[in-house]
Regions:
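Feature for intrinsically disordered/low-complexity regulatory segments and propeptides
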Residues: 1-166, 175
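Intrinsic disorder/low-complexity polar-acidic segments
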Residues: 157-229
Length: 229
């Protein structure tokens, strides 16, 4: 990475935390994430799952075939245990996509975990059989060499960088003296906390005197591409 402040989000467990005053770092990370993300519209009957077995010695060859990093292949072998064939080829599945995949495949998480641990070939067969009977389209989130979510075609995909821009514009109009308190990023969610202490009188003016002592008004924004759609 060119910027040492930016995080490589290839691994499923990648995350980043931001302290007060580090809003620019968060925004830069979100812009990098957007540059590394594609949303693919697929017919639900066109996507196909394959098992990803724990075969570290073959990871390099699999990575070449799928045109992804070896790191991504090894991580999926250890975690989600699935690859997905899309319009841009076969790609590893990230852990963050598992719940949305189970929703599409109409199987419970307990069933998924059992088959992932013991019978990955059976897992992909079950998913493919169910999807073959479904109709319509899905949106597939592909980011940092992996499939990160599978949602219905109605899902409104908005990048975190755009959400921050919308939030900034709103804050500029309503609370221009706000302060960035902290933030968090992972494949599962983005969380941003904004301190509105400069407007304490405005927010607490109708409360009894002394009731608001020790409290500070704030706004928390949470966004996720993992939630059900």
């Amino acid at each position: 990475l060119k910027d040492p402040d930016l995080v490589d989000f290839t691994l499923d467990g990648a995350e980043a935390q931001y302290k007060a005053g580090e809003y620019d770092k968060l925004l830069a990370q979100c812009k990098q994430d957007a540059a590394n993300t594609k949303w693919l519209e697929e017919g639900i009957r066109d996507i196909r799952f394959e098992a990803s077995h724990d075969e570290p010695l073959c990871a390099d060859e699999y990575a070449k075939q799928m045109k992804v990093s070896e790191e991504a292949v090894l991580d999926t072998q250890q975690n989600a245990g699935l690859n997905l064939t899309t319009c841009i080829g076969k790609k590893p599945v990230g852990d963050s996509a598992v719940r949305s995949i189970c929703d599409r495949g109409m199987i419970g998480m307990n069933c998924y975990e059992l088959l992932r641990k013991e019978r990955r070939e059976s897992l992909k067969e079950v998913l493919n059989l169910i999807l073959a009977e479904r109709k319509g389209a899905v949106q597939v989130k592909y980011s940092y060499d992996k499939v990160r979510a599978v949602h219905s075609a109605r899902y409104a995909a908005i990048g975190n960088d755009k959400l921050l821009k919308i939030m900034d514009d709103y804050m500029d109009q309503n609370w221009p003296d706000r302060e960035f308190e902290g933030g968090y990023l992972s494949h599962e969610l983005m969380k941003v906390v904004i301190d509105l202490g400069a407007y304490k009188q405005q927010f607490f003016r109708k409360l009894p005197s002394g009731f608001s002592a020790g409290y500070t008004p704030a706004v928390m924004m949470i966004s996720s591409d993992v939630a059900a759609s």
